[in-house]
Regions:
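Short acidic, S/G/P-rich loop/turn micro-motifs used as interaction or catalytic elements
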Residues: 11-14, 56-61, 89
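Acidic, metal-coordinating helix/loop segments flanking the phosphotransfer/catalytic sites
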Residues: 34-50, 60
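The C-terminal output helix
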Residues: 119-123
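Alpha4 helix (beta4-alpha4-beta5 surface) of REC/receiver domains from two-component response regulators
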Residues: 64, 84-104
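Conserved acidic segment of CheY-like receiver
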Residues: 2-22, 33, 51
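Conserved phosphotransfer microenvironments
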Residues: 52-73
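C-terminal output helix
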Residues: 108-118
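Conserved phosphotransfer cores of two-component systems
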Residues: 45-46, 72-79
């Protein structure tokens, strides 16, 4: 069965690059866009395997930052795997402290490390 990956709070161009990165890591995956809380609830109810969260959630979410949303998700969906997409080491450290898997930055998209991180998260 194909793995389900949700891109949470990303703009169109970033989503395109993330889709390419995900398809390189997991060819038969289903990638969905999550632009607000109702989309997120639907993805969680549908059994999403991995959430790739943007550092800043500009609209559509009760939380304004990805790390805040990771904390909330850990309380209500403790088994859902999350990763933060951010170039900032302090944001990555905060996400891991909140319960996320180690993420990656947008500048790393296309690198073997990103593909490995996504594959490992889906294993």
């Amino acid at each position: 069965m194909p793995k389900k990956i949700a891109l949470v709070g990303h703009c169109g161009p970033d989503s395109s690059f993330l889709r390419i990165a995900v398809s390189k890591a997991e060819r038969d995956s289903v990638v969905m866009m999550v632009d607000d809380d109702s989309d997120l609830k639907r993805a969680l109810d549908d059994g999403v395997d991995l959430l790739l969260l943007n550092r800043q959630l500009d609209y559509g979410f009760d939380e304004s930052e990805g790390v805040e949303l990771i904390k909330k998700l850990r309380q209500h969906y403790p088994h859902v795997k999350t990763m933060l997409v951010s170039n900032y080491p302090d944001a990555q450290a905060a996400a891991v402290a909140a319960g996320a898997l180690p993420g990656f930055g947008k500048r790393e998209l296309g690198s073997p490390r990103v593909a490995d991180a996504i594959r490992d998260a889906l294993a």
